[in-house]
Amino acid sequence: FRFVCIELLEEEGMVQFKAVQGVFHYLDLDYVGSFSCSDEKLNRIWDTAAYTAHLNMQEFLWDGIKRDRWIWGGDAYQSFFVNYYLMNDNDIVRRTTRMLRGAEPMTMHVNTIPDYTFYWIAGIWEYYFHTGDLDFVRAVYPQMLSTMTFVESRLDEDDLYTKRRGDWVFVDWSQFDKDSGPICAEQMLLIRAYDCMAKCAALLHDDKNEEKFGAAAKALCEKVNSRYWDEEKGGFVDDYTTGNRSITRHANIFALLYDLTSEDRKAKIITHVIKNKEILPITTPYFEFFELDAMCQIGEFDYMTDMLHSYWGGMIKLGATT
């Protein structure tokens, strides 16, 4: 519920309510996915999360039913995955994807956030992966190309993404320096965008752009592994240009999630970053999504279930209903 505050102007005033009416506004969709196990806490987490996802499925996929009730690219990107398994309503994914991108010409990043632009590109490939709907990929492909033209126009002389005027370098609500130079997490998302562009180009038999974006992904991946890796610390630093060699989880999670480094380095990341309590923990459910996805991909299922119990289970314990 949203809340209304009624202020009485008279000191001794009194108001009596005859009735309060609530309007429950939601899409009438069938659940195609379900979950049940012997762990009742996990069952409650699933049920609460599924209900939350359903509430956020309006004309578009909202970021939250309480606030902001807005279409944010990163939140939508995650919600697409949930939808494929929970409702499998492809229309809402297509509507949200088109709304996020907006009309031509592209003059700013999606929601002004570069990471959200990269997710927008990746989300289209993942939509095809889950649905096989090539017609939609074909329909938005011209916008994908113009989006990447915009992205390329804002890279630095080394073809790295660096913050430009009007950009909000978000990544996560986390305390690390995101404005000093070309941060690693953004480069890794750009690699993912290049890779997904190459895959979509291949679907449409656009050999020239398949080769172009595939080569760009490979070149940037090599550059990131060369410049951002710190062997002594066993992880990728946030920004190699500042000299402080600080490490946070975000870029290292992307390295695991998108398979952007060697198996040897992945093992070091798990030991020296992910399981290192001295590294600033992830504090938002938004980025926990990526962390737990990465942990599942590399088989760290105990880590995943422990986090579900402590983080989302903690919300349930405090009385959360969404």
Where in the sequence are the language-model features?
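Extended acidic/polar, glycine-enriched regions
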Residues: 1-44
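Structured loops at beta-to-helix junctions and adjacent beta-edge loops in soluble globular domains
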Residues: 7-9, 23-25, 56, 82, ...
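Short amphipathic alpha-helical segments with coiled-coil-like heptad repeat character
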Residues: 12-13, 57-60, 198, 263-264
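Short helix/loop capping segments that flank catalytic or ligand/cofactor-binding pockets
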Residues: 15-16, 45, 61, 139
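Glycine- and acidic
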Residues: 30-37, 60-65, 78, 105-107, ...
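Conserved, compact domain cores that house catalytic/ligand-binding motifs in diverse enzymes
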Residues: 39-99
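Active-site core of glycosidic bond-cleaving carbohydrate-active enzymes
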Residues: 72-322
